[in-house]
Amino acid sequence: MSGVNEIRSTFLNFFAANGHEIVPSSPLVPRNDPTLMFTNAGMVQFKNVFTGVEKRPYHRATTSQKCVRAGGKHNDLDNVGYTARHHTFFEMLGNFSFGDYFKENAIELAWKLVTKEFGLPKDKLTATVYIDDDEAFGLWKKIAGLPESRIIRIAGSDNFWQMGDTGPCGPCSEIFYDHGDKVWGGPPGSPEADGDRFIEIWNLVFMQYEQLEGGVRNPLPKPSIDTGAGLERVAAVLQGKHDNYDIDLFVALIRAIADLTNADPQGPQKASLRVIADHLRASSFLISDGVLPSNEGRGYVLRRIMRRAMRHAQLLGAREPLMHKLVGALTREMGQAYPELIRAEALIKETLRLEETRFRKTLERGLAILDEKSSTLKKGDMFDGDVAFTLYDTYGFPLDLTQDALKSRGISVDQASFTDAMERQRAKARAAWAGSGEAATENVWFPLREKLGATEFLGYETETAEGAVTALVKDGAEVEGLKAGESGAIVLNQTPFYGESGGQVGDTGVMSGDGVRVRITDTQKKAGDLFVHIGTVEQGTLKLGAALQLEVDHGRRSAIRANHSATHILHEALRQVLGDHIAQRGSLVSPDRLRFDFAHPKPISAEELARVEDIANDVVLENAEVTTRLMALDDAREAGARALFGEKYGDEVRVVSMGNAARDQASNAQASNAMGWSVELCGGTHVKRTGDIGLIAVTSESAVSSGVRRIEALTARGARAHANHNLSLAKAAAAELRTTVDEVPARIAALMEERKKLERELSDARKKLAMGGGAAAGGSASGIREVAGVKLMARAVEGVEMKDLKSLVDEAKKQLGSGVVAIVGRAEDGKAGVVVGVTADLTARFNAVELVRAASEALGGKGGGGRPDMAQAGGPDGSKAEAALAAIESAISRAG
């Protein structure tokens, strides 16, 4: 047994043969668990099973769980690449018993696997137990035959596990492998335990107590088992390696990186190769599970991981994006075990490529500032934390990247001042929000929800109903009544008004009764499920307890229904055209338009957009039934219902299905689910049949942020008006161009080509005129004179663009052979650009950047940039062109 894939299969198959259900790895983004940023252990997906909240159809399970540790207390990021066993991404092998077997069976199964299936020598294995766990101590003697000297009692948290301050807990027992006396270190619990001789390969947790407040522990009625073995560690032991990065999986990835960068895997660039290999896995798996790089939350952690790898790619000498070229090597190694990698391969590649392209610009700016600010520091010094925060806040340079860049020079970052700067910014944001008046208003809803309970929503079945006023709120405080002309928020015991959520806007309408009439302009959901109606009393006085007739604006609701159903259809159509990686990132469903944001790394072509629109309208024309049903969350997921990424769902969810499950094979759209063509978890309102949408017209496609695209669309009458408007524009264009509508594109293309030709001719004419008749500094007809022993060509020209100024300078340098060329171009808006060129033989004496900065200052500008042989700048005052040329001449004189 040698390969990682074989080791993983052996583990899972062993436990399957012993009555365990092989459960697929859960996503890296924990479902319905706000306490965790990422899945970081095998037991995470079984948390509710262990606590009794959730029931599963099995009592024994085994998994190979994807895990990421790169944030919070489990942050291994800084160590990755520099140690033998730190990773941001790793796989946790595990077996679990939910009130079935306990200690004896757990130890027996573990010992049988490591000694029989894995073939590890018994004399190389040592076990630890919690200090007072006599039962486990005796079982290791009985089952494994270990001598007491190799069953070590350990006190403290290392051998006692707790889910939290309260809840299930219990002692642990760990299996260690002894690498032999050639490696420094001592057994667990000894003074030399920090050495690498004894390596933990498996941790068995015996959940046998419930921790209560006050430190009391009661025995659990059904003790359980939770075990975890790091696959990379196990593979290293089985492959005879002392370093996780020497196992077959990492060797293959590092070889792929080395082939592209010509780096030596055993040379001084070893750490960079390892960083990239590790971070490639973390980045790719996070993207495949729906996380995209951003500046907050999980997306920011992903961006930090990606950018750290990209920084090391730059250290290896990569001059163009590298990471995306390595995804194929990763899918070859891990795609069979994790097919989601293969499904999302295109998204992973494009996301990595775009992020690295952007980051290279950030890296250049950030490193330049870092070099400047740390130029006077020496080994052992501290880098200013405020500057580190500026790099983070202004330039997108993560703190760990700053630390990493300074690490090789022995310079540390003042993290305390960095944290202070971060907190000052957060305090400003909190103060701004609190001072906006929103804080007081928001604070009223949670106590009301506790007092009144949830509002019963009737809007799926009806748009008219009766309701009683249970609370009135004005200016953030509860009131007894609202008079005519006053506006406020109204809470009812039940309502047909939909509260804004899931991207769908809130309903509007009218409430009336006993001389009172209220115009409702918005409906919102607060504190989870408290429906709050925003409105103005038009007649009478509205009082607490009033009975009202409630009527939603039917026409507006109808338009919203059509637009909401259209978003579902467009979502599935986008998946059909662009790939399975398409996942919703947000939406807006209003009566007059819809907006849909989704994960996709690049713009959608006109052809792709047309296909999406065609598929969507095929489903509309089918006039298929739209069905809704309530289902258990797990049943809905197993049935293939799509969920909004990051949304929290209860145990029971509403599933909306539309489109025929079995479609005509000649149709543009193909079946995606037995329940329907589009199947999503959704709490919004929808049409009865897809034909009620009428027509879907996509009006725009754009970028929202890195890796997130947006389409906007119209339905029904809005779509028809849009189509008619476009046709009118096409007819008007055809009339203006004296051609037919069908020939308009070809006619425009011909005109654009003619325009390009004329622009080229005009540019050439301007350049000839500029070099032949522009004003020359010093009055020389040719503009060439000698300054400080070198030839200087200095001219001011009119109407020449910056790109043309550069070509003029290049041509003039060739003509001069040796010398300096300076050309100032005055634009029509009064501004000026200046380009300075220095021939190669003179760059040791004259720097084009320094010369151009002197000119820029004369023009009222600041700075300038380029290379020693060619630089450019600009300024707002083109009337000072001659002064700019004189400044260059003076600078040459001083330098000469």
From Swiss-Prot:
Record carries keyword ATP-binding: yes
Cofactor note: Binds 1 zinc ion per subunit.
Ranges for region Disordered: 859-878
Keyword Ligase set for record: yes
Catalytic activity: tRNA(Ala) + L-alanine + ATP = L-alanyl-tRNA(Ala) + AMP + diphosphate
Entry-linked NCBIfam families: alaS (TIGR00344)
Protein's UniProt name: Alanine--tRNA ligase
Organism: Bradyrhizobium sp. (strain BTAi1 / ATCC BAA-1182)
